[in-house]
Amino acid sequence: MQKFTTFTSIAIPLERANIDTDAIIPKQFLKSIKRSGFGVNLFDEWRYLDHGEVGMDNSKRPLNMDFVLNQAKYQGAKILLVRENFGCGSSREHAPWALEDYGFKAIIAPSFADIFYNNCFKNGILPIVQDNNIMDEFFTLSGEIMINLDAQSIHTNSKTYFFEIDIERKRRLINGLDDIGLTLQYTDDIKAFEKDYFNKYNWL
């Protein structure tokens, strides 16, 4: 998992509430357990004019140009703005996989579904909670936003906002540690335990 550093990006304003995981990545694309390759089907039913299936050549599919992800001014955006209860529905981890594979590094919303919120951290995405009044301000922005995880701050052209985050989750994002990476930090301790254990119980 890549280390999360301070970055600046435009933000995509997807002004919808209660976006569930099936809207984020439809169920027909969940057959793979690899983390990569889901970005092209992110928000598939809104992004394309036809019905998507596994194996289709997405470059030849008709785009819905009214959908924000397809608009030229938002290409390359790393920040997603949404309304409340983002990531509700089934607890598929493919949803943050698709968001991360598309290129999103942070999602800002008034609230998130609990399991989705936890899965974001495990996949290197920073979910930021801001109240509705602040979200109203963000949705009117036309410039770039800078996110500084170390300072827990969001900077626009005119204002600075702050957000809360669990200190351990913050540490893991800053250091690029997923569950496996966190475990590997204790490799020497694990080897020492295994050696001691098998010396004591060598008949096992």
From Swiss-Prot:
Its EC number is 4.2.1.33. Keywords: Amino-acid biosynthesis, Branched-chain amino acid biosynthesis, Leucine biosynthesis, Lyase. Signal peptide: none annotated. GO terms for biological process: L-leucine biosynthetic process. Gene3D superfamilies: Aconitase, domain 4. InterPro entries: 3-IsopropMal_deHydase_ssu, Aconitase/3IPM_dehydase_swvl, AconitaseA/IPMdHydase_ssu_swvl, IPMI_Swivel, LeuD. One of its GO terms (cellular component) is 3-isopropylmalate dehydratase complex. It comes from the Bacteria. It catalyses: (2R,3S)-3-isopropylmalate = (2S)-2-isopropylmalate. The keyword Amino-acid biosynthesis applies. GO terms for molecular function: 3-isopropylmalate dehydratase activity. Pathway: Amino-acid biosynthesis; L-leucine biosynthesis; L-leucine from 3-methyl-2-oxobutanoate: step 2/4. Heterodimer of LeuC and LeuD. PANTHER family: 3-ISOPROPYLMALATE DEHYDRATASE SMALL SUBUNIT, 3-ISOPROPYLMALATE DEHYDRATASE SMALL SUBUNIT 2-RELATED-RELATED. Belongs to the LeuD family. LeuD type 1 subfamily. Catalyzes the isomerization between 2-isopropylmalate and 3-isopropylmalate, via the formation of 2-isopropylmaleate. This is 3-isopropylmalate dehydratase small subunit. It comes from Ruthia magnifica subsp. Calyptogena magnifica. The lineage of its organism: Bacteria, Pseudomonadati, Pseudomonadota, Gammaproteobacteria, Candidatus Pseudothioglobaceae. The gene is leuD.
